[in-house]
């Protein structure tokens, strides 16, 4: 059920350090752990932890799924592996729950909520996940699924 969990918001542009990976989304936590250790000096109270998944795991073989993970940084960061994520109008699904339920949240957003609205997917921008809290022991997260719309 997504009623009350989805709002339309203006998302800012984010400069982010990122790493690109191929593989099952189920093993993404390993890549995250390495990234967080490697870039720990760039993490501050204002850091956003951002994920971009490019493939639907029901359509793409797990080993071929593509994703970027990263963290927001200031303008002063000049590392080679930085990019600018374009913000703009997004449908933001505030998700709180077990990581295994994230896929169902995506399905609800795209198959139930979006078709019933006047909005359309803005395919010129990335769908991003912004993590607020992660409880590794319980496998629970609080995150925003940000779907660019027009």
List PLM regions with ranges.
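A solvent-exposed interaction/effector surface
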Residues: 1-150
